Amino acid sequence: MHMLLMNLAVLVIMCFVFYCLLFKFRDAKFSFLNLFRHKKRTVSTTIAIMLGGVSIFLYGGFIDYSFWILKEQTIRTNIGHVQIYNPKYFETSNKSRSLIADYANLKKEILNDHALSDDISTISGQLEFSGVISQYENVTSSFFSGLGVEPLPSLKLGSFDKVISGSDLSRVKTNEVTLGEGLAGTLNANYGDWLDIMTVNTHGGQGALSLKLRGIFSSGIKDYDDVAMKMPLATAQKLMGTDGVSKVLILLKNDNTDMFIDRLRHFIDEHHLPLIVKSWKDASIFYQQVESLLSGIYFFIKLIVALIVIFMISNAMTMNIIERTREITTLRAIGLQPLHVSRLFLLEGIFIGTLGAIGSLLIGFILAGIINLHGIAMPPSPGQTQGYTAFIKTNNIELIWLTFVLPVLTSSLASILPALRASRLNISDAFKFS
């Protein structure tokens, strides 16, 4: 909404400038040349505008990259772009009572629908369960939170899970598991060790298997790595005594998530399936919290920059009016209307804002290029164990537009009061000014 209002305001300013260039060219030329009469003031004001614009551009690019990397990390740590659930999934803590039955048939029907399959990169079911895992040779055991995954799709859906020992799950060997780094440390388990797994299956009985440790992974999220275990979906279904899954994850070829969700919901309604659909953003409370925090900080920075620019422009224009009082009154005395005088000063404010905006973009791109040569080393986020290298994203059209628009808009607004003040000078009193 605020961008729409800003765009409307800029449209009005552009119409005003084009009108002056076409029908009042002398006024536009006179206002532009006036910028060079007091070069020091013009340069200092332009530099202040550029500092604000560059700050918005660089921090906005940093925020964009942070959102992008957090989004990709969220999607590719076994969440996907879209998830399908049984409605009971969010109503009970016993996941065995909220399974999606006959997953294989559901997957086949979705892939046979070309309106959906054309946008799908990967589709995979996952079965959630928990229990106790033991390593008898080391006399260690621990609680685990298990995930049955399809090995091949999980390479994409879990691509941010970094394998630090061994390898990912095999499509052929179904008697192997991978553990989170923290859980493997608790069990003192290493590649090739045999682990005993016990759980309560969907029928209320005991499920038990002995499986071989194929690999150890790290997602960078400590709480998850301390309890995480993955095994092939077929093995997990055998252990739990079901052919269902807890959820179906879909990774898309593009980011048209909302459009795909609408088509998927239509498909579900058409087939009368008792299922619900959620996007990756709905499934990630952590992302929503981080987005709200960083967006709030960014808004505050934009507000501060806008106030600084308004103050600098207003102060410069006021000083300009004081120094040019005799000039203004002379123009008024030879017949210039108050509206004409206001137009001259408004154009000056718009021109200096435009110069500052262009300079902000040029310097912003140069500094972003220098920073991106090496990146910015970032510490781990709260609850995570791995830091990352951040960069400045410069391909966001909205950010580029904002960096240009904000200086122009704020300088135009800051010129209004000084322009009105100049047009209302009393001619007889102003001639006495020295």
Question: Model-derived features: where do they sit?
Answer:
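Short helix-loop junctions at transmembrane helix boundaries
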Residues: 1-7, 66, 343, 358-403, ...
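Peri-transmembrane interface segments
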Residues: 2, 66, 259-311, 320-322
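N-terminal Sec/SRP start-transfer signal
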Residues: 3, 15-58, 434
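C-terminal membrane-exit region of the final transmembrane helix in multipass inner-membrane proteins
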Residues: 19-26, 31, 395-434
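Hydrophobic alpha-helical transmembrane segments of multi-pass inner-membrane transport and secretion
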Residues: 39-66, 292-327, 350-359, 409-413
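Hydrophobic, regular-secondary-structure patches
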Residues: 60-143, 168-173
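Basic-flanked hydrophobic alpha-helices used for secretion and membrane insertion
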Residues: 182-278
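Transmembrane alpha-helical interface segments in multi-pass membrane proteins
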Residues: 318, 327-371
